From Swiss-Prot:
Superkingdom of this protein's organism: Eukaryota
Biased composition (Polar residues): 908-917
One annotated GO biological process: actin filament bundle assembly
An MF annotation (GO) of this entry: actin filament binding
Protein name: Villin-2
One Pfam family of this chain: VHP
Region (Disordered): 769-917
Tissue/organ expression: Expressed in all tissues examined. Mainly detected in the root epidermis and vasculature. Expressed in the root cap.
Keyword Phosphoprotein: yes
Paired cysteines (S-S): none
Length: 976
């Protein structure tokens, strides 16, 4: 590649961790200043370079080229070419991603948290400056429970629906509208966008309001929200468009790209199919990968990218299909997960391989090679350890019970046994914290391992599930476990009856350590976090010049220290000797000065190694969520993760390669909580086949709110976030805007309530009588007319809310009124129905039987939407109410009270339905959910037999339960 090919704009790119952006202007790459990062114009194309430095010190590169929806084809093509040039500057080892506006990858969006907001215009059409811009009210849809995708939609009622979350950004206030069927986690993420808009465009001073879809007990915020849309009226169903088409994942299909043609490759996918002289296309449906052999030429790589574009066009794939190009040796986890296994090579491809010409060229241009060269050794850091001074208790499994270890033996762990270790400590000013571990010796029998797990679960349950539970295997002990013992010594043999029986059955020699036996103990630790000693074979070949050893022979004990051993190791060896044989006098033997007695005890002098033991590969931590797709266990990586990515309804895996943490949210289903270790083992098996994760890696179960320091060290942890209660939306609302946005107190005094009710009735009469003689308007007419009528109606609804909500807590709610069109008549009927509801509810309420007012819930099932129908009888009732609207309102309400109460009692009853579905289809978290049903009445679609099987009672008995108790049962069985 000649010097002319490399764009000067890329000089110095990728020299330090961070984000660099270039915009394509007149077919040239122009750097974007950091102050403009995150601002993308729809008419332009951008190149984004993300440079990260792993724990080993090497640099990793991701190049994204972002294509705005209004950009020209020529600019998009220029970006693709420039991406190849930038990759050449970086040594040809970057992962490349194509990003389409509105369908960006999670990884790309993770660089610009909480979101990007594409702006109109571009280089060709000109940019609007801040001074030129007049504040414009904007309506957005907000999608995604992890990476947020924000899209501006027309500011009109027709844009709203029951399934999505919307943000209305006005000059004075920002509203978040939660569709009745919207996802709790999407609501929570939308709050982050609201805060971002408030800080960025309102200088952090505007008000924020949360409006829940379908709530008649509206407050002034909701009233003001609907006024902006011309007044309250039913909203329609969601209408799908091209942007909503999500490509389906399909079984991966591999093609070899040769001379621009794609040849399918049959058979099970394996790493051995990929040749380093060729390019391949892996079609996974929702994502297309281009795999590039590390010795392919630049022209071949360009041709492969072009072939992928032609393939997408010929297959008529949705715009949301992602295209990612990976280079051999730097494959992403998502790419490797499509193969049955991905055996680890002897080494990562050499950084120098195939780079001679490129390196020389870069040197001519003054571009350094920092991050490409091999990294320098990393100094060992002491990881976070648990607070010292706690209470340590240890038991070993003996048969079906646990036997406590005497205090003087705590720290001696036998390879043939299993142990339970409970450490109780204080962290700051909090109450007791617990670290409960099972330790499995290499020679322990399966029965003892199962017993240890059972006993640990029993202990955890007795402590109300608060302990951090760990399963730790001999030889893979983590620092925080080793640090509990001062010192820790792993000895041969075992004390348990199970081990003794297994030795007898196999007729094997029992090598159990005793103070009188001949034993050689290796001491290699240097600090409190690795002060572990291990009994090894009593032969001279076990020695190592970089370590210390204790040789026990009868009443004598030698301390042998290699020429390369440290003073810290010598001190630790002395401590271990005192632990094993208190009061023993040590005989020192330095390497090269050993006595004949020493060699005799070892069985004779032999050669031994003088090489330092290699340490495990240091890896960066990765966070994953998981799902079962068609019965197959799959994980999805969360990039640039933070504490806020841990959603309380989910389970996550934090993989550091040395340990695996399974984090369990408070709102996870109880059944899933019981299988956490089994799910974690599935992840370990998967990561073992793809990333070489050791099958005996330590694994922990960590419940939300009980995170230990050795977990939180991987996050910028805020303890206040961890103690907030509620679902994801409630937690986020409390943290960002205070608890008043989640828990509302609407209590009113008696006299004040009478006055407010009178004012509400007057407002209602005024709002409706003023327009009773006018013909019904269409939705568009109401949007175009003056806001006087809608404002009156909004004020009336707000007055009703203030007057009645504080005292209208009843055990049941009336059915949702049937929509009768978008005319003013339907609006009047809804308001009259609302008035009747609150009057009846107040009359029914008594201090003894009224349930405590719940906090304003973000669960759609807590609030009945306005637009759902019940039956034809209700429609006729609405017509009757409309006919009486010229009369005095309170008598009308009184006349309907008896009928309203009857309906209220029947609301929660399960209505007969022609269609029934299975329980698995109706569950809220179903993998194969049913569509086209009333999601607030999922239980109504169960057959009589399956209803009894799930709830344990008949439908009639269920109907007679109070509404709150029905809701509890529905939540319990995931039908809420």
């Amino acid at each position: 590649m000649s010097t002319k090919v490399l764009d000067p704009a890329f000089q110095g790119a990728g020299q330090k961790p961070g984000t660099e952006i270039w915009r394509i202007e007149n077919f040239e790459a122009v750097p974007v200043p950091k102050s403009e990062h995150g601002k993308f114009y729809m008419g332009d194309t951008y190149i984004v370079l993300q440079t990260t430095q792993n724990k080993g010190g090497a640099y990793l590169f991701d190049i994204h080229f972002w294509i705005g929806k209004d950009t020209s084809q020529d600019e998009a093509g220029t970006a693709a070419v420039k991406t190849v040039e930038l990759d050449a500057v970086l040594g040809g080892r970057a992962v490349q991603h194509r990003e389409i506006q509105g369908h960006e990858s999670d990884k790309f969006l993770s660089y610009f948290k909480p979101c990007i907001i594409p702006l109109e215009g571009g280089v060709a059409s000109g940019f609007k400056t801040v001074e030129e811009e007049v504040f414009e009210t904007r309506l957005y849809t907000c999608k995604g429970k992890r990476a947020i995708r924000l899209k501006q939609v027309p500011f009109a009622r027709s844009s709203l629906n029951h399934d999505d979350v919307f943000i209305l950004d006005t000059e004075e206030k920002i509203y978040q509208f939660n569709g009745a069927n919207s996802n709790i986690q999407e609501r929570a993420k939308a709050l982050e966008v609201v805060q971002y808009l408030k800080d960025k465009y309102h200088e952090g001073t505007c008000d924020v309001a949360i409006v829940d879809d379908g709530k008649l007990d509206t407050e002034s915020d909701s009233g003001a929200f609907w006024v902006l849309f011309g007044g309250f009226a039913p909203i329609g169903r969601k209408v799908a468009n091209d942007d909503d088409i999500v490509p389906e994942s399909t079984p991966p299909k591999l093609y070899c790209i040769t001379d621009g043609k794609m040849e399918p490759i049959d058979g099970d996918l394996s790493k051995s199919m990929l040749e380093n002289t060729k390019c391949y296309l892996l079609d996974c449906g929702a994502e297309i990968y281009i795999w590039v052999g590390r010795v392919t030429q630049v022209d071949e790589r360009k041709a492969a990218s072009q072939s992928a574009e032609e393939f997408l066009a010929s297959e008529n794939r949705p715009k949301a299909t992602h295209v990612t190009r990976v280079i051999q040796g730097y494959e992403s986890h998502s790419f490797k997960s499509n193969f049955d296994s991905w055996p680890s090579g002897s080494a990562t491809p050499g950084n120098e391989e195939g780079r001679g010409k490129v390196a020389a060229l870069l040197k001519q241009q003054g571009v350094g090679l920092k991050g490409i060269a091999k990294s320098a050794p990393v100094n060992e850091d002491i990881p976070p350890l648990l607070e010292s001074g706690g209470k340590l208790e240890v038991w070993y499994v003996n048969g079906k019970v646990k036997t406590p270890l005497p205090k003087e033996d705590i720290g001696k762990l036998y390879s043939g046994d299993c142990y339970l270790v409970l450490y109780t400590y204080h962290s700051g000013e909090r109450k007791d914290e617990y670290f409960l571990s099972c330790w499995f010796g290499k020679k322990s029998i399966p029965e003892d391992q199962d017993t240890a797990i059972r006993l640990a679960n029993t202990m955890s349950n007795s402590l109300k599930g608060r302990p951090v539970q760990g399963r730790i295997y001999e030889g893979k002990e983590p620092p925080q476990f080793v640090a509990l013992f001062q010192p820790m010594v792993v000895l041969k043999g075992g004390l348990s009856s199970g081990y003794k029986s297994s030795m007898g059955e196999s007729e094997s020699t029992d090598e159990t350590y005793t103070p009188e036996s001949i034993a050689l103990v290796q001491v290699s630790g240097t600090g409190v976090h690795n002060n572990k000693a291990v009994q090894v074979e009593t032969v001279a070949t076990s020695l190592n010049s970089y370590e210390c050893f204790l040789l026990q022979s009868g009443t004598s004990m030698f301390l042998w220290h290699g020429n390369q051993s440290t003073h810290e190791q010598l001190e630790l060896a002395t401590k271990v000797a005192e632990f094993l044989k208190p009061g023993i006098t040590l005989k020192h033997a330095k390497e090269g000065t050993e006595s004949s007695t020493f060699w005799f005890a070892l069985g004779g002098k032999q050669n031994f190694t003088s090489k330092k033991a290699s340490s495990e590969t240091i890896r960066d931590p990765h966070l994953f969520s998981f799902a079962f797709n068609r019965g197959k266990f799959q994980v999805e990586e969360i990039y640039n993760f933070a504490q806020d990515d841990l959603l309380t309804e989910d389970i996550y895996f934090l993989d550091t390669h040395a340990e695996v943490f399974v984090w369990v949210g408070q709102c996870v289903e109880p059944k899933e909580k019981q299988t956490v270790f089994e799910i974690g083992q599935k992840y370990i098996d998967l990561a073992g086949s793809l990333e070489g994760l050791h099958p005996k890696v330590p694994i922990y179960k960590i419940n939300e709110g009980n995170e230990p320091c050795f977990f939180t060290t991987y996050f910028s942890w805020d303890a206040t976030k961890a103690i907030v209660q509620g679902n994801s939306f409630q937690k986020k609302a409390s943290l960002l805007f205070g608890t008043h946005h989640v828990v509302e107190d609407k209590s009113n005094g008696g006299n004040q309530g009478l006055r407010q009710r009178a004012e509400a009735l007057a407002a209602l009469n005024s709002a409706f009588n003023s327009s009773s003689n006018r013909p019904a308007y269409s939705s568009q007419d109401r949007l175009n007319e003056s806001h006087d009528g809608p404002r009156q109606r909004a004020e009336a609804l707000a007055a009703l809310s203030s007057a009645f909500n504080s005292s209208s807590s009843s055990t049941k709610s009336p059915p949702p009124p049937r929509p009768v069109g978008t005319s003013q008549a339907s609006q009047r009927a809804a308001a009259v129905a609302a008035l009747s509801q609150v009057l009846v509810a107040e009359n029914k309420k008594s201090p003894d039987t009224s349930p405590t007012r719940r906090s304003t819930s973000s669960n759609p099932a807590d609030d009945i939407p306005l637009t759902e129908a019940k039956d034809e009888e209700e429609a006729s009732e609405v017509a009757g109410l409309e006919a009486k609207e010229e009369e005095e309102v309170s008598p009308a309400a009184d006349e309907t009270e008896a009928k309203q109460e009857t309906e209220e009692q029947g609301d929660s009853e399960i209505q007969p339905s022609g269609a029934t579905f299975t329980y698995e289809q109706l569950r809220a978290k179903s993998e194969n959910p049913v569509t086209g049903i009333d999601f607030k009445r999922r239980e109504a679609y169960l057959s009589e037999e399956e209803f009894q099987s799930v709830f344990g009672i008949e439908k009639e008995a269920f109907n007679n339960l109070p509404r709150w108790k029905q809701d509890l049962l529905k939540k319990k069985f995931d039908l809420f």
